[in-house]
């Protein structure tokens, strides 16, 4: 039938083969796709992963496997993403800009070369809940989504400076006189080995498993294995880094502290890095408040009497 068909938003491929060459077997085809053209920052070169100058907040269309801009596309596209519910002004593009730069940084690939820290090479074939898709993207970038009251922003686990300091002088003092209460993670939750599932392009794009271990922790605590899926991962080095991040996080971040603050706590969003000076923990007095300043006599009035060291 000579009819012109229309296939909107579809990459269509037609192949004609002789069925006698395959006998009774069904012909299967695999394609290596680059994927979608995304909106990326106007000062960004996706080929070299370089950022030039200061970004003015505008975008340009380009192919990119940067995880941050793949997430931006999913959140703002009106056809298959959340664009009908979230506008461009509702998503913190400036936070994604910093996250995208962190993902593009070159790191050792484990085989003598370098590669971007995090890339996204995934395809979504089924309709899923928006939160599940958002969680997959954020887990790969080691970040979490946060609604700060105005926009959907993102907080990433990466090296950063502290934003505030807390001590006994700026927290709520309970009746027992211990403002900081500590707790620890269970030993069973501190995994020292992880099996990371990822897609191996050198093995027909089949699922492979990368085993990551901390031998010193295994010798000390015994073997404690968990499993994880590396979303959008087609690099063995990236899979290894994902497993190593999980192990180090669970082995090193074992302590949590609970305390109450006043109105100044409203300055924070989840994921902020803070510093705590606990007198009971340190065994010394570590902080206080200035009650008054007299510029004429050049004197300070403190909240308690202190003894200055002789030196």
What role is predicted for each listed range?
Residues 51-54, 118, 174-178, 249-259:
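Short linear interaction motifs
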Residues 231, 237-311:
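Autoprocessing Asn-cyclization modules and mimics
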Residues 122-126, 147-149, 156-158, 198-200, ...:
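Active-site proximal loops enriched in glycine and acidic residues that flank catalytic Cys/His/Asp
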Residues 77, 81, 143, 151, ...:
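Short loop/turn segments at secondary-structure transitions that flank enzyme active sites
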Residues 150-153, 298-300:
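Hydrophobic residues embedded in beta-strands of well-ordered beta-sheets
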Residues 64, 126-130, 136-138, 145-148, ...:
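Active-site-proximal structural scaffolding
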Residues 1-141, 148, 199, 204-206, ...:
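Polar, S/T/G-rich
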Residues 3-6, 11-12, 19-21, 121, ...:
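Surface-exposed, non-catalytic interaction/assembly patches
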């Amino acid at each position: 039938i000579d009819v012109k068909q229309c296939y909107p938003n579809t990459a269509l491929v037609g192949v004609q083969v002789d069925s006698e060459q395959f006998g009774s077997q069904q012909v299967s085809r695999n394609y290596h796709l680059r994927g979608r053209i995304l909106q990326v920052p106007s000062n960004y070169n996706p080929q070299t992963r370089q950022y030039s100058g200061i970004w003015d907040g505008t975008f340009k269309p380009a192919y990119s496997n940067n995880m941050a801009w793949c997430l931006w596309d999913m959140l703002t596209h009106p056809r298959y993403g959340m664009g009908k519910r979230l506008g461009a002004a509702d998503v913190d593009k400036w936070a994604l800009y910093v996250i995208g730069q962190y993902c593009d940084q070159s790191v050792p690939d484990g085989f003598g070369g370098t590669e971007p820290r995090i890339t996204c090479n995934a395809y979504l074939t089924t309709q899923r809940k928006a939160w599940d898709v958002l969680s997959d993207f954020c887990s790969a970038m080691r970040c979490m989504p946060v609604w700060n009251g105005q926009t959907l922003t993102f907080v990433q686990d990466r090296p950063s400076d502290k934003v505030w300091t807390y001590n006994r002088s700026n927290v709520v003092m309970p009746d027992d006189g211990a403002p900081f209460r500590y707790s620890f993670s269970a030993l069973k939750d501190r995994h020292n080995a992880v099996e990371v599932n990822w897609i191996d392009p050198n093995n027909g794009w089949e699922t492979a498993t990368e085993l990551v271990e901390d031998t010193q922790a295994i010798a000390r605590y015994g073997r404690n294995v968990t499993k994880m899926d590396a979303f959008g991962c087609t690099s063995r080095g990236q899979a290894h880094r994902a497993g190593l991040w999980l192990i180090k996080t669970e082995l090193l971040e074992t302590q949590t502290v609970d305390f109450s603050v006043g109105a100044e706590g409203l300055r924070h969003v989840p994921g902020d890095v803070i510093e705590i000076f606990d007198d009971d923990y340190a065994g010394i007095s570590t902080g206080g408040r200035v009650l008054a300043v007299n510029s004429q006599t050049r004197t300070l009035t403190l909240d308690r009497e202190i003894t200055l060291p002789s030196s």
